[in-house]
């Protein structure tokens, strides 16, 4: 039987409980889960790629089948490189779907062997985004309900609480 591999891409700037929810649930469904940290050209990052990887690795250390990577290039090329045929994308609300559909259509056009699966974020986390968490943290407010302790500490350091 072949190994099932999936990729969860994202900027993870920083990782939140919403991301971790999708990662945990995906790790139960695939033999190997690869988190691919991508630089979003439309956003300036708060954390470096290396910092994001470290924060993610700490957040998923309880999962033996999860590996964290950085990749410059097309996501479908990363999938080819590691032999993954599934991309997993989390959806918080219907408003996420239009953007995700465009990405899925482009990825399918670039590589017809790669399928995208959507997973709804648990309702507890459906309002959380990295951008909102950073904005709240920048105002020195408590973000412990949205991110793990080590991420909260990193945010506090970035925004010098």
Curated annotation (Swiss-Prot):
InterPro entries: Cyt_trans-like, PPAT, Rossmann-like_a/b/a_fold. It catalyses: (R)-4'-phosphopantetheine + ATP + H(+) = 3'-dephospho-CoA + diphosphate. One of its GO terms (biological process) is coenzyme A biosynthetic process. It is found in: Cytoplasm. GO terms for molecular function: ATP binding; pantetheine-phosphate adenylyltransferase activity. Coiled coil: none annotated. The record marks 19 as: Transition state stabilizer. Its EC number is 2.7.7.3. Gene3D superfamilies: HUPs. Pathway: Cofactor biosynthesis; coenzyme A biosynthesis; CoA from (R)-pantothenate: step 4/5. Pfam families: CTP_transf_like. GO terms for cellular component: cytoplasm. Reversibly transfers an adenylyl group from ATP to 4'-phosphopantetheine, yielding dephospho-CoA (dPCoA) and pyrophosphate. Belongs to the bacterial CoaD family. Homohexamer. This is Phosphopantetheine adenylyltransferase. It comes from Staphylococcus saprophyticus subsp. saprophyticus (strain ATCC 15305 / DSM 20229 / NCIMB 8711 / NCTC 7292 / S-41).
């Amino acid at each position: 039987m072949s190994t099932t591999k999936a990729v969860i891409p994202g900027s993870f700037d920083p990782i939140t409980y919403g991301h971790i929810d999708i990662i945990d649930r995906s790790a139960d469904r695939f033999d190997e889960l690869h988190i691919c940290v991508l630089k979003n050209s439309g956003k300036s990052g708060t954390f470096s790629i290396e910092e994001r990887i470290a924060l993610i690795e700490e957040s998923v250390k309880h999962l033996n089948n999860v590996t964290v990577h950085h990749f410059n290039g097309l996501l479908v090329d990363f999938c080819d490189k590691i032999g993954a045929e599934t991309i997993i994308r989390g959806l918080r609300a219907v408003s996420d779907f239009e953007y995700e559909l465009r990405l899925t259509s482009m990825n399918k056009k670039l590589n017809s062997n790669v399928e995208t699966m959507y997973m709804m974020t648990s309702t507890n986390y459906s309002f959380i985004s990295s951008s909102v968490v950073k904005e709240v943290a920048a105002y020195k407010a408590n973000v412990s309900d949205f991110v793990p302790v080590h991420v909260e500490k990193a945010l506090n350091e970035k925004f010098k609480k």
